[in-house]
Amino acid sequence: MCASVKYNIRGPALIPRMKTKHRIYYITLFSIVLLGLIATGMFQFWPHSIESSNDWNVEKRSIRDVPVVRLPADSPIPERGDLSCRMHTCFDVYRCGFNPKNKIKVYIYALKKYVDDFGVSVSNTISREYNELLMAISDSDYYTDDINRACLFVPSIDVLNQNTLRIKETAQAMAQLSRWDRGTNHLLFNMLPGGPPDYNTALDVPRDRALLAGGGFSTWTYRQGYDVSIPVYSPLSAEVDLPEKGPGPRQYFLLSSQVGLHPEYREDLEALQVKHGESVLVLDKCTNLSEGVLSVRKRCHKHQVFDYPQVLQEATFCVVLRGARLGQAVLSDVLQAGCVPVVIADSYILPFSEVLDWKRASVVVPEEKMSDVYSILQSIPQRQIEEMQRQARWFWEAYFQSIKAIALATLQIINDRIYPYAAISYEEWNDPPAVKWGSVSNPLFLPLIPPQSQGFTAIVLTYDRVESLFRVITEVSKVPSLSKLLVVWNNQNKNPPEDSLWPKIRVPLKVVRTAENKLSNRFFPYDEIETEAVLAIDDDIIMLTSDELQFGYEVWREFPDRLVGYPGRLHLWDHEMNKWKYESEWTNEVSMVLTGAAFYHKYFNYLYTYKMPGDIKNWVDAHMNCEDIAMNFLVANVTGKAVIKVTPRKKFKCPECTAIDGLSLDQTHMVERSECINKFASVFGTMPLKVVEHRADPVLYKDDFPEKLKSFPNIGSL
């Protein structure tokens, strides 16, 4: 459209008036600019809050540029760490509130310089490692610069290395934090705890209820389910590039590379070397290196010099012994080399042991069994050793190789505690990428409730019933939780309708044309399926209401490993014929729900297409029947659980469809269905289907209650 323009034929008479208007315009503009400059200047010098975590950024981390806070000698000191703290006793989950993304929010305090009464600095300049840690948090989805939205608080006081700390004064500085509140919901990171002579296994700074992500916990100091055991970061991770080495036997069976070991430990190791010869290599610090050669990058055995950590890749097993501290950076080096760590450190809490299965990547040997370590390792099968080598490297890549990886893994563990229904599964924590099946998740290990925001993908299998197909699409599109609609066009002799003829719906609609007319096409793991939930529905199921479909989806969310559907069927044992029989009559029992209208997890599409036992898939395609029964067998066999029938509806025949249109009306159909059950039971070697005598209905179904107050008023009839 073009805007209409009107011209005034009395233009010359308006010239003096327009000059006056221009003069007023420029005077007004100048006044606004001047007022803006004055307001900006006043704001710069006017006292205002500086409590913004933007103030800890890189440009302001020099101690010379930050506010100075004087700590009087009598400043309050927090209590010692409360060893009885657990998440339900010392952590305030109500600060986290409802979060639709199931993500905690982390606030980083502004950087300040703390000094004592004599002006001596309490805290040193933030270390490079702590700077990287704060940067990792600030760049993550957990970060917030709004202190009022925060669930977790991280101080800008660096306590990674206790050797550099003034214990009392650091604790006093912690108590000055604006939201300290006895350390509730505060997280401290420490990798080198304790100091001479005791070398305690947890940070000695009094911290009251604060959570501690510590790098050297023992079973005596670790508050299980509250603290987080983290690795001691190895600087060599960033300095040395060790290409991944394939699993398998290596030059040395057992290697020790640590320096400064206790004499008794070294004697035991050297005794193993004498007993087992060249298969054991015990290295020590080099004493006669050329000038300029970094001793940290070299290890020696007698007069032979080895590059470190490269030498670790030449060993199958690498010893990780306790030093003055329980946690050792050598563990990270060993994992990077793909060497299986042999941890000999009684009571040591391995990093991220709350979620990582260390039995898959390491061998833990009691200190008293150190002399038997060689025979213990020899008893491990070679195939298991190779799997442990792969797992060791994977742990390093995912959780050890950078400060960022350590920080984010720590926050994820805490996040999983606060939102357990959305927690990362065991497989996601522990399985290397090669083991994971892309975006497919095993329903046996799903969170308690899948995220509702994802909704479901409806897959409609069709051939040429366009009119009823469009009616199904229109009805399904009314379901609030529908995310996408996928039409599987199974007719190779006829083109789908033109784009302009399809119903206009609120969600994406995609048509997939198949190469062959196979019933199994409905269960193919299409890339377009992005949701966990799938609704399989036939093109003649026009009777289901949006309330029925939405209720079915809600039930599936509670039971995501089940087949949740509408048409119920039963299998019976025919004593006269001595075989199984397919039953479609209404009874008190149900053992199958037909996938003409059923919800299931997309994982089962993968299993149906690639892992279906025997020749079942080909048999279904050849007979053009029973793909729904095959899916029932598959799900029941994997889960060991029964189907769930939802809503009372029992009639699903399309009133407009003729006998020619409806496959289920064929006279031989019932006989073939019985044959399918017997065929599948033979292939599976058992009868996995479970019989149940219940169904799921909305709570207020058939109650004398106003319809407008019911969540699902239109459940429909039989």
From Swiss-Prot:
SUPFAM superfamilies membership: Nucleotide-diphospho-sugar transferases
Enzyme Commission identifier(s): 2.4.1.224
Disulfide topology: 85-90, 96-151, 286-300, 318-339, 626-676
Alphabetically ordered keywords of this record: Disease variant, Disulfide bond, Endoplasmic reticulum, Epilepsy, Glycoprotein, Glycosyltransferase, Golgi apparatus, Hereditary multiple exostoses, Intellectual disability, Manganese, Membrane, Metal-binding, Secreted, Signal-anchor, Transferase, Transmembrane, Transmembrane helix, Tumor suppressor
Effect caused by changing residue 87 to R: In SSMS; decreased protein abundance; levels of the EXT2-interacting protein NDST1 are abolished in patient cells
Residues binding UDP-N-acetyl-alpha-D-glucosamine, per UniProt: 465, 490, 517, 522, 538-540, 627-628, 673
Cofactor: Mn(2+)
Gene Ontology cellular-component terms listed: catalytic complex; endoplasmic reticulum; extracellular exosome; Golgi apparatus; Golgi membrane; membrane; UDP-N-acetylglucosamine transferase complex
Entry GO MF terms: glucuronosyl-N-acetylglucosaminyl-proteoglycan 4-alpha-N-acetylglucosaminyltransferase activity; glucuronosyltransferase activity; glycosyltransferase activity; heparan sulfate N-acetylglucosaminyltransferase activity; metal ion binding; N-acetylglucosaminyl-proteoglycan 4-beta-glucuronosyltransferase activity; protein heterodimerization activity
Entry's localization field: Golgi apparatus membrane; Golgi apparatus, cis-Golgi network membrane; Endoplasmic reticulum membrane; Secreted
EC main group: transferase
Residues annotated for UDP binding in this entry: 461, 465, 490, 517, 538-539
Summary of subunit composition and partner proteins: Part of the heparan sulfate polymerase, a dimeric complex composed of EXT1 and EXT2. Could also form homooligomeric complexes. Interacts with NDST1. Interacts with GALNT5.
Protein's UniProt name: Exostosin-2
Originating species: Homo sapiens (Human)
Name of the coding gene: EXT2
